[in-house]
């Protein structure tokens, strides 16, 4: 029997979320309970632009109907402009749309706000006759989104964190039975923060908080009563070469997941390997450990004011070079390169090297998608 299990694990070790979708598409939540892979799928729904499809308030629309409208709104141009992660999410929508498992899911309370100071998105997914998954959107390609991510190292709460707390308190009502709160990337941090500072009525309804490769907190929040109280409900996943999920202070224990991708690209949760309704566990890689050490050295070397100055400098350099989004770094022109070189000349060596590493990874990621 043990040999059979080992063989099956070997055969199915390369399965991903898409395989899970296809295999369990005709299995209801009563037959096969909500699990960690459903959590990933629901967290991905918060990335979709449901503008003019899903209500900003409590009025609900069936998930399959919303998907049908959204897919009908896409054209070749909008599809081409999607990141690899979002292209995979759209492919998942096509399977979900025709899946009996998700036929009785409903969407409501859609939020998507981007301005000069913050990037915030959220969505409620209602399922299983009274249960709800509150999903928080992760970082998009905008500079403001990434700047707010880095602000986690010196500010609490950020504007997005404030919105997340208010949102969770607002959308959960007496009719909701079991509540799950989760998100991918920055959305995972927002999920933790929202639960930590939600009111007691909401906390009593929340069964689990999912952080899917999202960053942690500063020392102050990490050592707080609110954080320690949350740990009993927290489930955190990071891939073996995690970059985002190991930023700042992580919980004492988390699950490390194998991926079909390598390096920073493992952040794409569509690449995470699964076996049935469980992720295939691995070990934290050298890349992840070394990256965390470098970032921790910088974070611990400066006070909050200095860290804020460094982040402002980082994004001022990019803005002066005419870069408005990380989507266009692959087509950067020579005069923009010169502007960046000019901007980083006065930065200390350690910070400059980190800047170049991060910037290079974005260029490589965009080039990878074009091949």
Please describe what each predicted stretch is.
Residues 1-13:
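Short, Lys/Arg-enriched N-terminal segments with co-localized hydrophobic residues
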Residues 14-104, 108-132, 136-178, 199-371:
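Alpha/beta hydrolase fold serine-hydrolase catalytic domain that processes acyl esters and thioesters
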Residues 178-180, 193:
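Catalytic cysteine-centered active loop of the rhodanese-like fold, especially the PTP/DSP P-loop
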Residues 183-187, 191:
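Gly/Ala-rich beta-loop-alpha elbow adjacent to hydrolase catalytic centers
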Residues 191-200:
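Short glycine-enriched nucleophile-adjacent loop
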């Amino acid at each position: 029997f043990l040999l059979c299990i080992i063989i099956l694990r070997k055969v199915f070790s390369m399965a991903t979320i898409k395989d899970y979708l296809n295999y369990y598409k005709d299995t209801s939540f009563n037959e096969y309970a909500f699990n960690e892979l459903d959590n990933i799928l629901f967290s991905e729904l918060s990335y979709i632009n449901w503008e003019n499809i899903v209500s900003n308030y409590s009025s609900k629309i069936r998930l399959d109907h919303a998907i049908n409208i959204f897919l009908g709104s896409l054209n070749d141009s909008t599809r081409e402009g999607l990141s690899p992660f979002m292209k995979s999410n759209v492919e998942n929508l096509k399977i979900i749309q025709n899946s009996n498992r998700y036929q009785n899911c409903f969407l409501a309370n859609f939020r998507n706000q981007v301005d000069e100071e913050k990037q915030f998105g959220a969505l409620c997914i209602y399922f299983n006759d009274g249960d709800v998954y509150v999903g928080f959107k992760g970082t998009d390609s905008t500079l403001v989104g990434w700047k707010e991510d880095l602000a986690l190292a010196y500010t609490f709460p950020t504007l997005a964190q404030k919105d997340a707390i208010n949102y969770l308190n607002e959308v959960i009502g007496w009719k909701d039975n079991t509540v799950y709160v989760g998100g991918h990337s920055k959305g995972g941090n927002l999920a933790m923060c929202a639960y930590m500072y939600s009111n007691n009525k909401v906390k009593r309804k929340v069964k689990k908080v999912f952080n899917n490769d999202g960053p942690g907190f500063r020392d102050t929040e990490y050592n707080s009563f609110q954080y320690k109280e949350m740990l009993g409900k927290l489930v955190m996943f990071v891939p073996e070469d995690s970059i985002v999920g190991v930023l700042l202070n992580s919980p004492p224990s988390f699950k490390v997941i194998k991926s079909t991708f390598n390096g920073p690209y493992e952040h794409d949760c569509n690449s995470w390997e699964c076996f049935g309704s469980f992720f295939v566990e691995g070990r934290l890689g050298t890349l992840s450990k070394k990256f965390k050490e470098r970032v921790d050295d910088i974070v611990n070397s400066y006070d909050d004011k200095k860290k804020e100055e460094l982040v402002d400098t980082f994004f001022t350099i990019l803005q002066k070079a005419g870069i408005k989004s990380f989507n266009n770094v692959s087509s950067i022109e020579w005069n923009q390169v010169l502007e960046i070189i000019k901007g980083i000349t006065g930065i200390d060596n350690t910070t400059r090297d980190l800047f170049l590493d991060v910037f290079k990874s974005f260029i490589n990621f965009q080039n990878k998608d074009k091949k």
